[in-house]
Amino acid sequence: SFVMGFMRSGTTLTQEVLDAHPDVFVADEVELVPALKRELHGIEKRGTSTAEKLALLDQSGVEHLRDFYWQKVYDRFGETIGDGLFVDKLTMNTIDVGLINCVFPDSKVIFVMRDPRDVCVSCFMQLMVPTPTTVQMLTWAGTSRFYALVMAWWSHVSKQLTLPFLELRYENVVANFEASYRNVFDFLGLPWDASVVDFHKRAAEKFVATPSRTQVTKPLYASSVGRWRSYESDMATISVSLDPFIDEFKYRQ
């Protein structure tokens, strides 16, 4: 299964809750799917874009990519993954969800959502290591434009996915943690385990590879919901980018 979304949307929280379940192993921000995409571009010489190459790929090519992915998993984690559910959490796998749909058509995707305004405030104010992704968010306008590009892609591609996916709202998690994650575990075909309620205690004992590491080692709190209201005047300057998604995702109040 896969956990994805947009940065600062709550993917790390979901990762830690899932990882607290005894029958789940979560790979935290490990570039397994990006490696898979590079392998696709290496074995399929026809076409130029990832989509074109996937369309030209035969079944043996799909099976090769599937084997390649799992070899990467075992090279990295070995037998520590156990025999439970393996979850690949890389937030920006959103961009490559079409590749996932092709290679792993029986997998499940949890797509974590949050109010676009809170996402952009949090991304812009968070100190992040420079990467090809994070450099898109060095300015207020750049942050909103990048968010709009990624979420427009999700809005488009999610209608074409054949694999099952669940959209999980951060605000619902904060308002009703247990009901939200009971729904998640039911979607994944796993029984509820009360130990996940104390996810923050487990997270405090290990390394978390994202800027959210300080938040997920504490009990859940609601202060980050509606944080954008403190910057309401600044929101007007990026409304052209965010308004379509505020409406589409029903965050208009």
Task: Report residues per predicted region.
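PAPS-dependent sulfotransferases, especially Golgi type II membrane carbohydrate sulfotransferases
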Residues: 1, 46-85, 123-167, 175-253
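Conserved beta-strand scaffold positions in the cores of enzyme catalytic domains, especially
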Residues: 26, 109, 165-167
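Phosphate-binding active sites in nucleotide-utilizing proteins
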Residues: 1-104, 112
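Conserved nucleotide-binding/hydrolysis micro-motifs of P-loop NTPases
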Residues: 31-33, 116-119, 173-174
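A secondary-structure boundary/capping signal
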Residues: 29, 169-170
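Conserved coil-to-alpha-helix start sites within the AMP-binding
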Residues: 94-97, 118-119, 151-152
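Conserved phosphate-donor/acceptor-positioning beta-strand/loop module used by diverse small-molecule
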Residues: 100-124
